[in-house]
């Protein structure tokens, strides 16, 4: 295989994309990245970068036709997936495939596949496209419930509603967090689960491989901490792998899929799936012999996927900072790195207006509890320059 002739175009240039591009660069692959704003994280390490509205079909198709990449790799949901379907029909290689990109761009498509076609166990749910429909479905779902925009990312617009006086506020919050013109929401029965995991699932030319389960803590619908491995009963792990394989086989294509699952005893509930590396999987930058970004790249281009190993218990902590500046300066990294078991990735985002994830702390230890505490201690040192 001559990988030096491969040309990868990444649609979206965030922090996950940056690590993916670094993995490609290390193997001598030509990289092109695209996003809606200049100097996005992945643009800082790619050979070429372009700024376009990826929801604009003409702009997206013109750029792809002009650059003629070997592989087109979506990193975000805010892409015109109808264009991807069209381009795939003209023999462009969409990762993992246009069907997966289109189905997972909104929660309605993927939930219909999981619950209705595959009969996977999920929470009780309903969709609503207006405030009145929302009020109606609440009657059947009951309190407490979770509301999420049909189209959103990074937890935007998600909330848990426990009291009647929170119902209106949650609807408004979902509308403000919705992406594009979509106003629909999914209302889900709240499952009092024991824990939630991400099961990184790798579809490749030789079959399907799994990483050890990743435990994580979410706040306001967004990842804050993750750790690997998450200890769980063999029965629940086997069921989790079965569900992950079933949903990823239905989506098809090659690459890493982040399968989110709720676990209650030996019961496993499907939550969501993303056809790309997962933010909770950033812990694999320190925990595994091959991290999730390298796995994604290998699966895409057809390189071998050997035995995936967790080298040591590890944890990650999102560096979520708050401020209002166009030139963010981060302090405390020296103190955080004083611990030999800590590493840090700063994403290279300059602007921050409100709260923004600016980096990640990585820590390793003899067990995940200590690794998590170590990551939190290092995180406490990091702040914006005043």
UniProtKB/Swiss-Prot annotation:
Residues 112-301 form the ATP-grasp domain. ATP binds at residues 107, 148, 153-158, 188-191, 196. One of its GO terms (biological process) is 'de novo' IMP biosynthetic process. It comes from the Bacteria. It holds the Pfam family RS_preATP-grasp-like. It catalyses: N(1)-(5-phospho-beta-D-ribosyl)glycinamide + formate + ATP = N(2)-formyl-N(1)-(5-phospho-beta-D-ribosyl)glycinamide + ADP + phosphate + H(+). Pathway: Purine metabolism; IMP biosynthesis via de novo pathway; N(2)-formyl-N(1)-(5-phospho-D-ribosyl)glycinamide from N(1)-(5-phospho-D-ribosyl)glycinamide (formate route): step 1/1. Keywords: ATP-binding, Ligase, Magnesium, Metal-binding, Nucleotide-binding, Purine biosynthesis. N(1)-(5-phospho-beta-D-ribosyl)glycinamide binds at residues 15-16, 75, 279, 349, 356-357. Mg(2+) binds at residues 260, 272. One of its GO terms (cellular component) is cytosol. Its EC number is 6.3.1.21. It is an enzyme of class 6 (ligase). GO terms for molecular function: ATP binding; magnesium ion binding; phosphoribosylglycinamide formyltransferase 2 activity; phosphoribosylglycinamide formyltransferase activity. Involved in the de novo purine biosynthesis. Catalyzes the transfer of formate to 5-phospho-ribosyl-glycinamide (GAR), producing 5-phospho-ribosyl-N-formylglycinamide (FGAR). Formate is provided by PurU via hydrolysis of 10-formyl-tetrahydrofolate. HAMAP family: PurT (MF_01643). Homodimer. Belongs to the PurK/PurT family. This is Formate-dependent phosphoribosylglycinamide formyltransferase.
